[in-house]
Amino acid sequence: VASQLPRRGSFLALSLGFAPPLCYHKAIHLRKEKCTVEKLSQQMMQSVCVGVLAPLVVVGAVGKLPQRPPAFSGQDSSVTVHLTDRDDMALDAYLQRVLLGEMPVSFEPEALKAQAVAARTYTVKHREKHNGKLCTDSTCCQAFCDEGVLAAFPGEARERAAAALRETDGLVLTYEGALIDATFFSCSGGRTEDALAVWGTDVPYLCSVASPGEEAAQYDRDSVSFSREALEAALDISLGADRESWVGAATFTEGGGVEAMELGGQRFTGVYLRKALGLRSTAFTVTVEEGGLRFDTRGYGHRVGLSQYGANAMASHGADFQTILSHYYPGTILLNYGESVEK
């Protein structure tokens, strides 16, 4: 979630004046501990490639293998970023821009540290997925502040993000020796969701956990109404004359999201309805109104993994970043990246 703005994607869109969210694709090419980032044309969805370092662990000369991999520092490694110009930046400089785009810097320091570890883990884990490309679409990858957006942040804000990265330098989350998929989102509405319920894949460390203290989140509750005609067009259904038949049976997940719901006699998954109707989350209720339906949602995002507002609530009550991460990613272990088994 961009600082003080409701959507990660719209953070860049509003800052740069584009109507749709600006999408940065992070092309990853290993080239002597660096990677090349190239800007694509605006005709290609106004997308910009951003390179993400894939750090190399040096094993030494033949016959002199070290007992353990060296510690990994984001400050010592670098990426090459091509926006309008070519630039060299340390991995932590790249992650600073991610952190500023993902979480309000007014959040507690321990929450910022937790987000820093999650973002670092996400970056190095996904460097080779999707042909080495990631993007800042909030439904897909991480936000990234370009030079103009970065300059809009006061020095104190940039320093708070940099401090969170320094104080967690090189730390990543692992599960059974492998880097995890460190997914995160804005707020859950009180409980996170299980990865199986959202993406159909059972991931032990992405299970449903309580996330108290999110009531103060400005995006925790939302309400949106749709006319009958709009719903019929969006879902390709016919609601009929009997309003009481518009909404049928529903099932719910452990995390409180809609697993499936009948509308107009057809059954839809909660994930599909969220996407088709642009809802903030799958945790919603439906009320029949005169001429249409009202959807009341809790939470913002896919609700799997780290809740950013939940992390801030935990930090405000004294939890350190290690405790926050172990709560939202149960069973995971913090390691320096050089110590993790799978890169």
Predicted feature locations:
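Cationic, low-complexity basic patches in intrinsically disordered or flexible, solvent-exposed regions
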Residues: 5
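Glycine-biased, low-complexity coil/linker segments
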Residues: 8-9
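Conserved, single-site charged/polar hotspot
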Residues: 20-343
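Acidic, Ala/Val/Gly-enriched low-complexity intrinsically disordered segments
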Residues: 1-2, 13, 19, 27
